[in-house]
Swiss-Prot record:
Belongs to the argininosuccinate synthase family. Type 1 subfamily. L-aspartate binds at residues 120, 124-125. CDD domains: ASS. One of its GO terms (biological process) is L-arginine biosynthetic process. ATP binds at residues 10-18, 37, 118. Its EC number is 6.3.4.5. The lineage of its organism: Bacteria, Pseudomonadati, Pseudomonadota, Alphaproteobacteria, Rhodobacterales. GO terms for molecular function: argininosuccinate synthase activity; ATP binding. This is Argininosuccinate synthase. One of its GO terms (cellular component) is cytoplasm.
Amino acid sequence: MSAPKKVVLAYSGGLDTSIILKWLQTEYDCEVVTFTADLGQGEELEPARAKAEMMGASAIYIEDLREEFVRDFVFPMFRANAVYEGLYLLGTSIARPLISKRLVEIAEAEGADAVAHGATGKGNDQVRFELAAYALNPDIKVIAPWREWDLSSRTKLIDFAEKHQIPIAKDKRGEAPFSVDANLLHTSSEGKVLEDPAEDAPDYVYQRTVNPEDAPNTPEYIEVGFERGDAVSINGEAMSPATVLTKLNELGGAHGIGRLDLVEGRFVGMKSRGIYETPGGTILLEAHRGIEQITLDRGAAHLKDELMPRYAELIYNGFWFSPEREMLQAAIDASQAHVTGTVRLKLYKGSVRTVGRWSDHSLYSEAHVTFEDDAGAYDQKDAAGFIQLNALRLKLLAARNKRLGK
């Protein structure tokens, strides 16, 4: 790749991307445009602007993408009940396509030669950023400094920062912070003591949730309303997508809901350990499953459950903009036509549980399932023929085994 003259950098204002900004300037002698996405990470983003200005960025973009993030990425994913490896709600994975989309759009608007990101050469994010970028612009050039420079450790990064007078953030304990990714859906923490999967994560790692043991001793009941698979209200109050998730985060965080200690299989081949906090997402998943229980046909629900792991894997691996993800999304969205109604949930000391659900689109018929007199709604004699037909192949198999002496 010829040396770029202008690069758009996905910039958080943190240590890694600040070092990358300086490295791009010194390594390529190029203009650097910074792009900072507000995805609800809960930080004041103006310091990122000030830092980028101080370091000589030629243009600075800071954009509030919270509504777009939840409406166009998080909610479609939750219609699928997507979970990776049975536990992970994909909080980091689902944020990357939107960041890449805006990186490419800004690069085109600025006439930039390339885009750059701060993902390491060991992780999944490098794949996610770059697959999304190439899917949107096949001619885009991507610079991944972690795959080029010799700053191969946190210690070397800090030495570089000190040499170039780049401020180094400290945590409350006066130490360099964990590697943290945060957005409106979740917070993840990696590195340091967490790299030993045998060690219990210290409580100071958690930023978004109280310890469940310290959560209120009285449960809280809430109601979440859905329309066509998307949450639209809490306790009867209509809300925008980002507002729904923000409120669920507040409720879940106060009750210690959504903590996860996970060793996951990365797309690049290795296993990694992360601490995830997804309070609102954990409530949303439980609520969505609750409303589907009464509105989704059994066959459609079971097919959705079969498709979900593949869908989740596509998002985890960075294939949001792939045709196969879009095909699955179309099927999932079609299944949500009648997923409308209300779910009541109980929040208590780290747990969320559906305790009630109702809908004008419900398939639940009390007349058919009652243990009392069903007034002729269901003739139990019909079950005999149903069983005989389904038993036929099993009886034929058993007869063959008997004939062959097995």
